[in-house]
Every structure is written in C-alpha cells, then in structure tokens.
Amino acid sequence: MNTENEFVIFELSNGLRVVHKQVNRPVAHCGLMINAGTRDELADEQGLAHFIEHAIFKGTKKRRSFHILNRLDSVGGEIDAYTTKENTCFYGTFLTEYYDRAIELISDITLNSIFPEAELEKEKEVVLDEINVYLDTPSDQIYDDFESQVFKNHPLGNAILGNVESVRSFTKTHLEKYIDRLYTAENMVFSSVGNVSASKLKVKLEKYFGAVKSGKAIQERNSFKSLPRNVVRIPKETFQTHCILGKAAFSPDQKKRLSLILLNNVLGGPAMNSILNLKVREKYGYTYNIESNYSVYTDSGLFSIYLASDPKYMNRCITAVQRELKNLRQKKMSSNKLSLAKQQLKGQLAISRESNNNIMLSYAKSLLVRNKIDSIETIHQKI
C-alpha cells in the first residue's frame, strides 16, 4: 500500500485500483468508477453507456429492481449513478455501519445484472422521455450541438443520451457485449471515504469485487484531431438566443492545464466577480447567464463560453466577449490580480473538499484518468 498524505491507494489481487480516505464521520461514501462512457460506444451503440447506467438497476441474479433500490434506502442511505463522455459511476451514501451492505450492492448490480427484456423495454421509454426533456431545454441541447461540431466524426461528439433510433434498438446482447469489453478490473477504480480502516476495506473489496475479470479493456480509444474553425447557426423557436464559443483545449497531462483552469475561473467561473459576469451582465445588462467552462478528457480538453440573451442583444454580447478575450491576450495581468485569482481558486478548491462525496468522486476520477492523486497541498503549490 502507498500512503500519500490523507489517503491510501492500493490494488486488489485482480488489479482493480482502490483509493480510500479514513474519516471519523458517521456518514460514509463509496463508489465504483469505470473508464467506459460515450466515447467507447461503437457506431450502433450511441447512448448505450447511459442506458446501461439505467438498466443496471433493473434486476440481478438475486434481486429485483425494488430490492436494489430499497437496499440502502431502507436504512436512510441512497444509491445513484451517472454517465459522462468517458466514465460511468455507481456510488452510494450511507451510515458507516452499513459499509458492507453498500459495497455488496454496488458489486451485485455491476457484476450480476441480468437485464430482463421486459424491464429494458420499460426503461427505454424513461430514457426517451429524458431525451425529449433535453431537447426541450436549449441551454442543455446547445452543449451537445457544440460538441458535435468540435469533435465531428469522433465518438466524443456523440450525445450521452443517444438518440431515439439507437435507444429503441438496444437489446440485452448489446448491454452484455459492452460490459464484457469494458468492465474489467484495470479499467475500474473503487473510491471510498468513511470511518473504516484500509485493511478492513480491502478484505471487503476482495470478497465482493475479486470476481471482476482481470486485465485491461479490450477496446482502444480513437485519438482526436482538432478541426478548422467553424460557425453553426441552428434555427429554433425560443424566447432567448443561446450561444457557445469555444475550441478543443489541453489534455490532463499537459502542463498548461492548470493555467487554463485558473484562466477559466477568472474569465467566467462560478464567482460573481468573474470578468464576463462583471463586464457583460453587470455593466451592460445584456444577459442573465454567462459562463466559461473547461472540460478535460483523457487525450483532449474542451474550453467554452456559454451565454443566453434576448436576440437583439446577442451580437453585442459576442462583441463584448471577444473584446474581453482580446484584453486578456494583449494586456498582461498585474501581479496583484494574479495573486488574488490564485487565492480565489485555492479557496474554492478548499471549500469543495468540505464535501466527502465530492472528495470520493474526485479521487476516483483522478486515479482513473491520471493514475495518481494530488493532495490539496500539492495542488495549491502548483497553482
């Protein structure tokens, strides 16, 4: 076992990586993160990773759907899941005394799901309704439209939810083949934050996850190449006009990544004193919602600026954004402003660490993507 400040990292006998932080709290959090998401789907599988996230709760060899949902709910806990372009995660929150129950449940649904055909057909309707809700929300849909242009003809450009045709086509065989390709020990990380020792946790995990197939994922990911600049306008009957400007950005292993994280925070991060909020919303009143985002993928990244406004103000908004970007390029930030920006980011990171569930999920993703975890002190030093 390797101890790195506040957490412990170790491997199970089959190669499944584990990160654990022991805390003296009555509530614990744990989850299994799998390096399998939308970009790992084949041409006829669009939306399959997300559909599996739903279907995996519909029955195992020893439990029906109700018993899966009730297993942690009945003792005040909860189980949940989510899918991204590159990951699928199943995780739970519970009282410490139910650690064994939570681990066994996550193991059961990920290793022993039977995907009853009748349940799959019902769940298709749920997912199709989710797609319709998404299509009715232009502030969400525009992100899919944007990524489909930036990552054109690449799986990263596919929508996480898939489309109506693909979802309707899924069968039990589709689900089983995807899981067989990608749900392997070396393609997973188990993350835990709670009041249990690492040695006891390892015993539990060997018991419940020792049966996970060892080895790496069978499928290799396609690399991404940047495309030329492009402008796309999509007509839609809405009260507001929605806009995203952006491009492919740094991957996790590039040194400039932290600089872009800091720049993103200064430009359009969550704080009310971000440049775009002050200059476009507060100064001119052109928009209610304007923000910048930096998403990181295994071998690439995505930087974007989103805004929505009355159509008559959209050109003014875009001009104002371009002016602020030009100022950032041409005018060097003062030492004082840079110091304040760094302090703000450090404070935000520290506050995010107040949530043990956030810690559990961030540890899992870092170990899965980068195969290492930086302590908060190390991150502060790099900033």
How would you name each of these model-derived features?
Residues E11, V18, S65-F224, R233, ...:
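Charge-rich, well-structured scaffold segments of protease-associated domains
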Residues G15, Q22-L72, F146, Y183, ...:
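Active/ligand-binding-proximal structured segments within catalytic/core domains
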Residues R229-N230:
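Flexible, small-/acidic-enriched active-site or ligand-binding loops
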